[in-house]
C-alpha cells in the first residue's frame, strides 16, 4: 500500500488544479522558502481528516481555500484528492485503488468522498485506522512536531504508540460500550420503577375486571331480553301499519272516483272557458281591426293633404345654379389655349437660348484652346531661361503650395471650431440633464428612507399581529379543550345520575304524583362537604322527596306492583323540632361544625333534614371524629372524607361509590366551570376575530409598503441607469470637446508654422524677382488671344443668364393652363348638377300629385271597411254573452264536486299521516335497534322475533351438563316460547342486578389485559436489560484486556527499537522509554530518557536543539519500525541537523524505505541524494505554487506533475 497521487484544487497556494504522482520509496519535495512546500503536507493531513486549523497553520478552517492574489481572484472552494494503491488489501475495502476526496466551501460546508461516493468523516477515519493511520496523524510529522513530542505530557506520548498499534479502535469500542452502560443504567432504573408501579396497579384493576366480567354477563342477558322485546314491538307496529294502509287504500279508491267525475266537469268547464276566450280574442281582434282601420283612414287623409301641398310647392321654378364665376366654360378653355400657345413660345425661346449657350460654350472652349496654345508657345520661347529661373519657379510653387495648405488648415480649423461648439453644447445639455436626474435620485433616496422605515414598521406590526393571533388561537384551543373536557365530565356524571333503582322508576313513571324530585337536586351543600353530608344522610342522599305519608305509600305500592325495585322516600311534611343543635347555640370543639349548618334546603324539607342530620357533627379527620364521639356519645361524627363514627360503631374505608348528592354537586361545579370556560372561549373567539381582522389589515399594509418600496427601488434603478447613460454621454462629449480642442490647437500651431514658412519663401521669391535680369517679352497676339477668351467667357455667362430667365418664365406659364382647364371642367359639372336637380324636382312634383290622387281613392275604401268592422264587433259580443251563461252552470257543478274531493282528500291525508306516523315509529324503533344493538331489522326479527323460542340459559345448560356428567338420566332443557311479560321481568331483573353492582369500569377487562401484558413485557425487558448490562461489562473487560495486551506488546517492541535507533543516531549514547505507572497499564504515560555520549543529562530540556530533534526522530523511527505504516510524510525534520547526524538519520530512512513510502520536505542536499524522486516547488510573482518533478533513479526524467490553469 502506498500513495499514488495527490490532486490539489484551490488548496492554499495551489490555485490551479495540480496533481502529484508518487511511487514507492523516498520522495523529496524541495524549493525556496515560502514557495508552498509545506502546503503539500497540509493537504495530505487535511484530506485524511485533520480537524485542527492550527495544525494546518491557519486561524480557521476556511483559510485552506485559495485567498486570491493581485492577478487572480479568490476561489470559492478547496478540494484535495489522494489516491492510495490498495493492491495488498491493507485497507478493509474491496478496491485495488482507493481515492479519498475532501471538499470545503466558503460558507464552511464540507464534503467527503471515497471512490466518488459521499461519506462521513468517521468513515474516512475508520478506513485509515486499520492501516495504522489514526486521528493523531503520527505518520505526518510537520514543522514543530518534533519539539511537541518531547514537550508533550507522558500520556500524549502514549497516544502515538496506541495509534500505531491500532489501540484507538479498541478504545472507541470501550467508550461506546461505556456510553451504552450509562444509558442502560437510566433505562434499568426506569424499567424497575415501571414494573413496580404496574405490579401495584394490577391487584385493584383485577377486582374491577371481575366486576366488569360479571356486568358483561348481566348486560348480555339484558341485551337478549331487550332485543326480544324490541322485535315484538317491531312486529306489532308493522301489523298496525298494515291495517292503516288498508284503510288508506279504500279511502283512496273513493277519492279517485270523485276526482274522475270532477275531471269530466272540469274538462267541460275548460271547453266553455276556451270558447269564451276564443270569442273574447276574436272580439278583441275585431275591435283592434276597427281601431286600426280608423287610424289608417286618418293617416291616409293626412297623406293626401301633405302630397297636395308638396305638389304645389314643387311647381315653383328653382334658383340659378351659381354666380361664383361669370365666365362660361368655353371662355375658360379659350384662355387656357392662349396660355398653352404662350407656353410653347417660351419653350421655343428657351431652346434657342440653350442653343446660343452651347454655341458660346463652344466658342469659349476654342478661345481657351488658342490661349493655351499661345501659352505653350510662350513657354517654349522662354525655355532657355528655365534653367536660370528654375529656382524662382520652385520658390513660387512652394509659396502657392504653402498658401493652399494655409487655406486648407483654415477650413479645418473652422470645421473644428463648429464641432467644438457643438460638443460643448451637447456636454452642457447632458451635464444639466445629469444634475437634474441626480437631484431626482436624491429626492427618491430620501423617500426610500421613509419607505424603508414604514416597511419595517409594518412588518414589525404584522409580526406582533401574527404573534397575537397565534397566542389567541392557542388560548382558544385550550379553552375549547377545557369546554369539551367539562362537557364530557358533565355527561359522564349525568350517566351516574341515571339510576336503575326504584327512585329512577318513580321519577320516570310517576312524576307529579306527589313527587318533588331528588334530594340531591333540592338540597344545596357547602362546597367541600358533599362526601360528609352524603355519608351522614346515608341512603337518603339518593332519595326522592314526596308530599307526605300518603304519597309515600302510593309510591311504594306502585313499585311493588310494577316490580320497579326499591326506593328511599323523604317526607316533606315532617314537623321540625323547636330547637335543633345548630340553632340552640350548643358549642362544638374547635374544627367541628354542625351538619345542619352546611345544608340549604327548601322549606318543605327543613323538618326532614333536621330529623336526619340532628346530632351529626362534621370534623376534619377520623381521629377528631373518634375523639368527639368518645366525649359526647350521643353525637355522630362524620369526616370530610365520608367516614362516619357513632357510639360503638364506625363506617368508612375506601372504594366508596359517589352518592347522588356528590354527583349532583360535582355536576353543578362542572357546570359553573363550563359556563366560565364557555365565556372565556367566547371572549377569546371575539378577541381572535378582532386579531384576525387586525392581522389582515397589517398584512395588507405590509404588502402595500413592500409594493411601494419595490416601486421606489424600480424607479431608483431606472434613474441610476439613466444617470449612468447621461454620465457616459457627458464624458464622451467632454472627451470629444477636449480632443477637438487639442486638434484645433495643433492645427493652429501648424498654421502658424506654415505662415512663417510662407513669409520666408515669399521673401526669398521677392529677392529672386528683384535680381531677375532677363525679361521675357509677351507677344502681342497672345494678349489678343487672351482678350478674345475673356470676351467669349462674357458671352457664355450672358447666354447662361438668358437660359435661366427663359426657364423661369416657362415654369410660371406652365401651371396656368392646367388651372384654367380645371376651372372649365368644374363649371361644366356644376351646370350638369343644376339640370339634374331641376329634373328631380319636376319628377317629385309629379309623384306627389299621383300620391294625392291614389290617397283619395284609398280613403273611400277605408271608410267602407271601418263600417263593416263595426258590424262584426257587435255580432261577436252577442255570441260571447251566450257562452258565459252556459259556463256559469257548469262552474256550479265543478264547485260541488271540488268540495267533495276536498273532504275525501282531507280524510286521505289523515290516513296518510297515520300511516307516516306508524312508519316513523317503526323507523325510530329500527334506528334505535341499529344504534343501540347494531342489528338490522330483518336480522332482529329473524333471530329474536316472537316466533323464535328462547334457548336454555347458560345456567340451565350448565346444570344439564353437570347432571349428565354425573350419569343422571336427564332431558336436555327445551326452548321456551316467547312471553312478553316474562321478558319484561327478565329485563328488570337484569337492570336491578346491574344497579346492585354499582359503578363498573367497562374497560377494566381490556385495561387489565393490557396492563398485565405490559407488565409481562416490561419484566422480560428488565431481564433482557440486566443480561445486556452484564454482557457489556464483559465486553468492557475484554476490551481492557485486549488494550493491555496490544499496548504492552507495542511498548516492548517500540522500547526495543528505540534503544537501537538511539544508539545508531548517538553512537556511544544511551536512550530508553520508561512507563510512568507500570502498575496501571491502561492509563500509564511514557517518559523518554536520553543520554548522548559523554554527557550526564537527566532532563530533556537540557539537550541542544539538534539533540532534541534527533531524540524525537529516534522515538518516531522506533514507532515506525515497531509498527510500520504504509507511508510517512515529514516536513523538514532534519533541518536542525549537521551533516554527520543527517547522514545517520538518512541511513534510517533508507531502512524504512524497504517497508514504507516516505515523502519528505527538505532543503538538505544529502536528503535529495537518497531520494528516488524530486519535486521542485516554485512560486512566481503571482503568488501561485507550481510544481516540477524529476525521477532520480537511472537519471530518467518523467513528467509526474500536471498543472492546468
From Swiss-Prot:
One of its GO terms (biological process) is chromosome segregation. Residues 169-288, 330-499, 661-771, 802-836, 979-1033 form a coiled coil. GO terms for molecular function: ATP binding; ATP hydrolysis activity; DNA binding. SMART domains: SMC_hinge. The keyword Nucleotide-binding applies. Residues 514-628 form the SMC hinge domain. SUPFAM superfamilies: P-loop containing nucleoside triphosphate hydrolases (SSF52540), Smc hinge domain (SSF75553). It is found in: Cytoplasm. InterPro entries: P-loop_NTPase, RecF/RecN/SMC_N, SMC, SMC_hinge, SMC_hinge_sf, SMC_prok. Keywords: ATP-binding, Coiled coil, Cytoplasm, DNA-binding, Nucleotide-binding. ATP binds at residues 32-39. GO terms for cellular component: chromosome; cytosol; peptidoglycan-based cell wall; plasma membrane. The keyword Nuclease does not apply. Homodimer. HAMAP family: Smc_prok (MF_01894). Belongs to the SMC family. Required for chromosome condensation and partitioning. Contains large globular domains required for ATP hydrolysis at each terminus and a third globular domain forming a flexible SMC hinge near the middle of the molecule. These domains are separated by coiled-coil structures. This is Chromosome partition protein Smc. It comes from Mycobacterium tuberculosis (strain ATCC 25618 / H37Rv). The gene is smc.
Amino acid at each position: 500500500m502506498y500513495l499514488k497521487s495527490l490532486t490539489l484544487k484551490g488548496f492554499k497556494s495551489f490555485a490551479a488544479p495540480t496533481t502529484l504522482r508518487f511511487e514507492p520509496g523516498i520522495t523529496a519535495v524541495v524549493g525556496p522558502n515560502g514557495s508552498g512546500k509545506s502546503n503539500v503536507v497540509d493537504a495530505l493531513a487535511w484530506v485524511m481528516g485533520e480537524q485542527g486549523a492550527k495544525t494546518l497553520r491557519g486561524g480557521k478552517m476556511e483559510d485552506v481555500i485559495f485567498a486570491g492574489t493581485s492577478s487572480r481572484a479568490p476561489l470559492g472552494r478547496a478540494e484535495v484528492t489522494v489516491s492510495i494503491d490498495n493492491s495488498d488489501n491493507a485497507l478493509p475495502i474491496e478496491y485495488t485503488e482507493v481515492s479519498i476526496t475532501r471538499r470545503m466551501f466558503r460558507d464552511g460546508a464540507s464534503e467527503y468522498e471515497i471512490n466518488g461516493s459521499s461519506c462521513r468523516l468517521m468513515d474516512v477515519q475508520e478506513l485509515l485506522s486499520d492501516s495504522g493511520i489514526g486521528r493523531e496523524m503520527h505518520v505526518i510529522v510537520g514543522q514543530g512536531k518534533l519539539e511537541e513530542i518531547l514537550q508533550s505530557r507522558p500520556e500524549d506520548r502514549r497516544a502515538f504508540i496506541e495509534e500505531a498499534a491500532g489501540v484507538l479502535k479498541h478504545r472507541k469500542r470501550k467508550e461506546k460500550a461505556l456510553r451504552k452502560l450509562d444509558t442502560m443504567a437510566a433505562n434499568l432504573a426506569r424499567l424497575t420503577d415501571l414494573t413496580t408501579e404496574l405490579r401495584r396497579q394490577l391487584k385493584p384493576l383485577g377486582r374491577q375486571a371481575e366486576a366488569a366480567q360479571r356486568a358483561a354477563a348481566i348486560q348480555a342477558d339484558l341485551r337478549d331480553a331487550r332485543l326480544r322485546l324490541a322485535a315484538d314491538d317491531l312486529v306489532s307496529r308493522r301489523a298496525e301499519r298494515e291495517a292503516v294502509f288498508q284503510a288508506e287504500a279504500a279511502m283512496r279508491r273513493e277519492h279517485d272516483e270523485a276526482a274522475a267525475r270532477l275531471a269530466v266537469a272540469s274538462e267541460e268547464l275548460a271547453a266553455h272557458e276556451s270558447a269564451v276566450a276564443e270569442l273574447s280574442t276574436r272580439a278583441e281582434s275585431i275591435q283592434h281591426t276597427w281601431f286600426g282601420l280608423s287610424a289608417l283612414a286618418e293617416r291616409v287623409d293626412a297623406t293626401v293633404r301633405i302630397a297636395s301641398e308638396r305638389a304645389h310647392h314643387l311647381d315653383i321654378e328653382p334658383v340659378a345654379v351659381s354666380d361664383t364665376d361669370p365666365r362660361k366654360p368655353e371662355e375658360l378653355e379659350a384662355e387656357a389655349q392662349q396660355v398653352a400657345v404662350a407656353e410653347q413660345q417660351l419653350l421655343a425661346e428657351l431652346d434657342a437660348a440653350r442653343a446660343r449657350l452651347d454655341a458660346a460654350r463652344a466658342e469659349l472652349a476654342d478661345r481657351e484652346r488658342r490661349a493655351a496654345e499661345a501659352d505653350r508657345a510662350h513657354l517654349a520661347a522662354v525655355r532657355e531661361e528655365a534653367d536660370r529661373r528654375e529656382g524662382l519657379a520652385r520658390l513660387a510653387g512652394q509659396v502657392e503650395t504653402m498658401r493652399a495648405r494655409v487655406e486648407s488648415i483654415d477650413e479645418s480649423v473652422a470645421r473644428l471650431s463648429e464641432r467644438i461648439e457643438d460638443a460643448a453644447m451637447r456636454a452642457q445639455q447632458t451635464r444639466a440633464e445629469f444634475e437634474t436626474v441626480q437631484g431626482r435620485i436624491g429626492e427618491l433616496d430620501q423617500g426610500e428612507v421613509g419607505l424603508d422605515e414604514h416597511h419595517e414598521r409594518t412588518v414589525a406590526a404584522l409580526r406582533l399581529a401574527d404573534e397575537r393571533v397565534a397566542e389567541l388561537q392557542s388560548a382558544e384551543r385550550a379553552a375549547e379543550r377545557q369546554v369539551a373536557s367539562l362537557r364530557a365530565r358533565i355527561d359522564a356524571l349525568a350517566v351516574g345520575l341515571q339510576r336503575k333503582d326504584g327512585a329512577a322508576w318513580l321519577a320516570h313513571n310517576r312524576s307529579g304524583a306527589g313527587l318533588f324530585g331528588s334530594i340531591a337536586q333540592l338540597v344545596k351543600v357547602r362546597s367541600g362537604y358533599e362526601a360528609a353530608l352524603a355519608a351522614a344522610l346515608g341512603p337518603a342522599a339518593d332519595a326522592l322527596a314526596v308530599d307526605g305519608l300518603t304519597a309515600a305509600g302510593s309510591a311504594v305500592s306502585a313499585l311493588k306492583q310494577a316490580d320497579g325495585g326499591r326506593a328511599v322516600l323523604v317526607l316533606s311534611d315532617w314537623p321540625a323540632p323547636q330547637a335543633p343543635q345548630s340553632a340552640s347555640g350548643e358549642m362544638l370543639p374547635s374544627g367541628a361544625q354542625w351538619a345542619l349548618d352546611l345544608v340549604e334546603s327548601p322549606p318543605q324539607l327543613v323538618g326532614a333534614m333536621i330529623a336526619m342530620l340532628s346530632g351529626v357533627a362534621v370534623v376534619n379527620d377520623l381521629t377528631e371524629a373518634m375523639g368527639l364521639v368518645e366525649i359526647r356519645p350521643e353525637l355522630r361524627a362524620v369526616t370530610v372524607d365520608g367516614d362516619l363514627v357513632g357510639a360503638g360503631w364506625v363506617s368508612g374505608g375506601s372504594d366508596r361509590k359517589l352518592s347522588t348528592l356528590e354527583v349532583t354537586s360535582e355536576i353543578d361545579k362542572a357546570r359553573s366551570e363550563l359556563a366560565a370556560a364557555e365565556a372565556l372561549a367566547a371572549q377569546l373567539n371575539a378577541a381572535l376575530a378582532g386579531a384576525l381582522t387586525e392581522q389582515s389589515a397589517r398584512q395588507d399594509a405590509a404588502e402595500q409598503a413592500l409594493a411601494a418600496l419595490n416601486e421606489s427601488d424600480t424607479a431608483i434603478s431606472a434613474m441610476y441607469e439613466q444617470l449612468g447613460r447621461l454620465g457616459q454621454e457627458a464624458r464622451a462629449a467632454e472627451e470629444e470637446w477636449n480632443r477637438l480642442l487639442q486638434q484645433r490647437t495643433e492645427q493652429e500651431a501648424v498654421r502658424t508654422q506654415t505662415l512663417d514658412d510662407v513669409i520666408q519663401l515669399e521673401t526669398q521669391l521677392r529677392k529672386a524677382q528683384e535680381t531677375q535680369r532677363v525679361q521675357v517679352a509677351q507677344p502681342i497676339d497672345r494678349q489678343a488671344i487672351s482678350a478674345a477668351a475673356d470676351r467669349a467667357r462674357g458671352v457664355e455667362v450672358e447666354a447662361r443668364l438668358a437660359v435661366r430667365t427663359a426657364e423661369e418664365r416657362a415654369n410660371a406659364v406652365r401651371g396656368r393652363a392646367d388651372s384654367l382647364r380645371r376651372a372649365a371642367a368644374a363649371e361644366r359639372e356644376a351646370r350638369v348638377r343644376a339640370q339634374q336637380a331641376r329634373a328631380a324636382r319636376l319628377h317629385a312634383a309629379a309623384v306627389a300629385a299621383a300620391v294625392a290622387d291614389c290617397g283619395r281613392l284609398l280613403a273611400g275604401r277605408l271608410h267602407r271597411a271601418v263600417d263593416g268592422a263595426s258590424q262584426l264587433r257587435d255580432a261577436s259580443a252577442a255570441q260571447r254573452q251566450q257562452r258565459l251563461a252556459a259556463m256559469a252552470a257548469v262552474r256550479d257543478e265543478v264547485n260541488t264536486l271540488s268540495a267533495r274531493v276536498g273532504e275525501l282528500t282531507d280524510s286521505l291525508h289523515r290516513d296518510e299521516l297515520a300511516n307516516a306516523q306508524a312508519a316513523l315509529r317503526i323507523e325510530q324503533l329500527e334506528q334505535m335497534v341499529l344504534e343501540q344493538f347494531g342489528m338490522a331489522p330483518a336480522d332482529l326479527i329473524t333471530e329474536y322475533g316472537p316466533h323464535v323460542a328462547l334457548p336454555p340459559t347458560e345456567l340451565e345448560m350448565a346444570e344439564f351438563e353437570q347432571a349428565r356428567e354425573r350419569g343422571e338420566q336427564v332431558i336436555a332443557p327445551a326452548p321456551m316460547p316467547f312471553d312478553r311479560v316474562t321478558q319484561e321481568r327478565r329485563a328488570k331483573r337484569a337492570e336491578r342486578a346491574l344497579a346492585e353492582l354499582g359503578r363498573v369500569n367497562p374497560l377494566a377487562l381490556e385495561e387489565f389485559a393490557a396492563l398485565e401484558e405490559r407488565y409481562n413485557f416490561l419484566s422480560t425487558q428488565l431481564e433482557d436489560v440486566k443480561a445486556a448490562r452484564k454482557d457489556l461489562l464483559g465486553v468492557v473487560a475484554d476490551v481492557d484486556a485486549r488494550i493491555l495486551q496490544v499496548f504492552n506488546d507495542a511498548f516492548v517492541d517500540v522500547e526495543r527499537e528505540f534503544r537501537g535507533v538511539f544508539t545508531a543516531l548517538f553512537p556511544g549514547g544511551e536512550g530508553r522509554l520508561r512507563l510512568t505507572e507500570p502498575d496501571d497499564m491502561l492509563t500509564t504515560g511514557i517518559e523518554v530518557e536520553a543520554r548522548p555520549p559523554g554527557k550526564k543529562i537527566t532532563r530533556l530540556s537540557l539537550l541542544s536543539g539538534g539533540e532534541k530533534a534527533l531524540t524525537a526522530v529516534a522515538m518516531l523511527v522506533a514507532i515506525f519500525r515497531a509498527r510500520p505504516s504504509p507511508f510517512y510524510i515529514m516536513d523538514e525534520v532534519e533541518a536542525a541537523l549537521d551533516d554527520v547526524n543527517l547522514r545517520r538519520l538518512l541511513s534510517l530512512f533508507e531502512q524504512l524505505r524497504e517497508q514504507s513510502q516516505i515523502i519528505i520536505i527538505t532543503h538538505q542536499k544529502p536528503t535529495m541524494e537518497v531520494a528516488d524522486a524530486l519535486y521542485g516547488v516554485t512560486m512566481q510573482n503571482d503568488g501561485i505554487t507550481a510544481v516540477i518533478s524529476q525521477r532520480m533513479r537511472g537519471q530518467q526524467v518523467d513528467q509526474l506533475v500536471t498543472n492546468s490553469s
